[in-house]
Amino acid sequence: MASVGVLYVHMSGVSSEILKNLVLAGIRAAICDGRPYPSAIASMPSSFLPPAERSGAENDSSAADADKEEGSPAKKARPATVASAMQPHVVELNPLLDGCEINESLVEDVPDEYFAQFGIVVASHLSVEQAKRIAKATVSAGNKFILVDTFGLEGCALLDLGPEHQFRKEMGKDKLSDVMKIDPYLPFADMMDVPLSDMTARWDKRPPKVLTTYLSYLEYQAKTGKWPDEENASDYADKTKTWLAESKIVGEDYLGDDEKLKHIASLADAEVSPVCAVLGGVIGNECIKAISGKAEPANNVLMFDGVDGGCRTFLLKKK
């Protein structure tokens, strides 16, 4: 596992938890996040970057103390990007690993070849367009792609482990099955093209609400170029009702009335620390299963509901 590198694209509360778990397990991390620091992650829950450090209060306090001491060195310049801010903390977390590579370019400026060199790419807060591009580049090289986000008390992950991923199912103590492949397999781009009306299963007569909420965020971002928030909550509510009604499997009020939809819009960027920690632990375990080839992986959606504490899988497939 030590030879596998995991690339984190756009740090979030949940991806920082995944990073922490895997780095402590001895799996190298690289970060691709050229967003401005600290504004891009001002509200992100993270033990890596304490609020005082992100607000600049820590630096200001250090500078004031330094001014009192004659000949004291000047304070360090604040990192310009999220990647550069995270790097020293990741290195400190596990000094035995070979550093932490960073890429400070904006995601849209990073070539496909860069993503293809990592065993697993874990991404958050991406547009569907960029997620499809990165997933294709990663999986085409024989690697794995995971898109994961949390929103309020819920979280959702979409996993593309590739058509050739092999694993052995656990059959009992110290006993594994013959080599198996994921079946059915659906590429990430095709997952995004599955209509809402086809997102049903034996125990799900209608699309799961956690998944529907996440897809509504991605749908709104694809249409407007912006993530839902309090400022555009009314527009999100209108567009989401239309999107739901067009599915013809649920009504426009499936996720709630106008006020509920406006509240859902305000949660798109709201990351809750315990939710990030739990889902981050689950995804970290999925990464280890993917790397080792031991145990059956999730195929191809994971949903977490913080109200009941349940995390379950769901299969997106063509019908």
Residue ranges and their predicted role:
Residues 1-319:
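Adenine nucleotide-associated cytosolic modules
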